[in-house]
A protein has these predicted regions:
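N-terminal, motif-rich segments that launch catalysis or mediate targeting to/interaction with membranes
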Residues: 1-105, 112, 117-226
Length: 226
């Protein structure tokens, strides 16, 4: 493996660590009932599942709702970014921990269903970013809506596989970078963009009206991929 790919391996592997620790085998505590925005480094043994998203809520049937908890992906991105410069006085341990989380959360918040939650009579407490909504894509299996959109970004069983797809298949080289948007560093702006996309495309028909399993149309799946 070349030095460049070794460096990529480290970053790709680090970027999924925040999901890896959800596995009880890693010894981290599921703490969803006690949200906290603490930043103490690797001594923190909580999973912090609620750091992975910011639920911007909406309803299409008049269901009333309140804003979600203020501790979320955006609050943590801001906290971690502030600790990264050496001028922050934070320890190397803390800055390393924050970098690992940032690699993950910035990716999460660009997935529309990490920034969108529909409130409805069927799910008055919210659909948890599509986790409570079942859909059937053209492949024929039933999957939750959130998982369907997660797969839009690729799924790999190994870090080298992800790197191969990004490099050797021209994944990165084919990306067209919007130089104006690339200068937008405000996570609130990223989140709003994801919310707009989620509301428009993730919850379009047949998902919008179906209360059991939404059989996805070709139009829906084409819009999702694009």
């Amino acid at each position: 493996m070349s030095d460049d790919k070794k460096a990529q391996y480290a970053f790709v592997h680090a970027a999924v660590w925040a999901d890896d620790i959800k596995d009880p085998a890693h010894g981290y505590t599921k703490d969803d009932d006690t949200p906290t925005g603490q930043n103490i480094g690797y001594a923190d043994k909580n999973m912090h599942r609620y750091w992975h998203f910011k639920d911007v809520r909406f309803s299409t049937d008049g269901t009333q709702f309140v804003d979600a908890d203020p501790i979320n992906a955006v609050s943590q991105i801001k906290l971690f970014v502030a600790a990264l410069p050496t001028s922050s006085g934070a320890s190397d341990d803390l800055r390393s921990y924050d970098m690992v989380w940032l690699l993950h959360l910035i990716g999460d918040i660009h997935q529309p269903l990490h920034a969108t939650e529909r409130m409805s009579a069927i799910n008055p407490d919210g659909d948890r970013g599509g986790n409570e909504v079942n859909v059937m894509p053209a492949t024929g299996e039933t999957i939750d809506l959130h998982g369907y959109w997660d797969r839009m970004f690729g799924g790999y069983v190994s870090v080298p596989g992800a790197i191969f797809d990004a490099n050797d298949k021209g994944g990165i080289s084919k990306l067209q970078v919007d130089s104006v948007k690339a200068k937008i560093l405000d996570p609130d702006v990223w989140t709003h963009e994801s919310f707009v996309l989620g509301k428009k495309f993730a919850y379009e028909e047949p998902v919008l009206s179906e209360n059991t399993v939404a059989v996805l149309t070709r139009t829906y799946e084409t819009d999702a991929r694009n």
